[in-house]
């Protein structure tokens, strides 16, 4: 029998791309002040990415961005404590690799979720984001009257 000693070696780590995060935040309509606050280094890149992914589900980057979110926990420690208390563990998985799919259909995200192998999925919550605030894509191929009918139908919901 060979005598061995346990060894832990970090062989890879998550790296945040601040420019990509900024693009997502701007696309969501987050204010300059909140973008600056969020992009200030907050712990490890894995922690920052995890927080980013979790906040994306609820559009909870700042007060007023999502009218259904009544309390914004600005400090990462307080934010993570709340996530863990609620049992929202899926956002913790984002410490490996993450993609932001913006302005895609539920059909698209459903296919991504169905074929997830070793990936974490966090999706905009339809319980917390008002249906009239959900973005949707209208194909250019639709005639203008069809696009208007589709838009009117969504507005009526």
Where do the protein language model's features map onto the residues?
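Family-specific signature for flavin-dependent thymidylate synthase
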Residues: 1-157
């Amino acid at each position: 029998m060979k005598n061995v000693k346990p060894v832990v070696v970090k062989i890879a780590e998550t790296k945040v791309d601040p420019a990509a995060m900024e693009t997502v935040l701007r696309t969501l309509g987050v204010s300059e002040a909140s973008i600056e606050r969020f992009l200030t280094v907050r712990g490890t890149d894995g922690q920052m990415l995890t927080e980013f992914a979790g906040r994306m589900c609820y559009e909870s980057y700042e007060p007023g961005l999502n009218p259904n979110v009544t309390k914004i926990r600005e400090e990462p420690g307080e934010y993570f404590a709340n996530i863990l208390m609620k049992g929202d563990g899926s956002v913790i998985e984002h410490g490996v690799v993450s993609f932001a799919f913006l302005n895609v259909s539920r059909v698209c995200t459903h296919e991504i979720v169905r074929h997830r192998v070793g990936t974490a999925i966090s999706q905009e919550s339809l319980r917390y984001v008002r249906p009239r605030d959900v973005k949707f894509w209208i194909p250019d191929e639709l005639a203008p009257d069809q696009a208007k009918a589709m838009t009117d139908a969504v507005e009526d919901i």
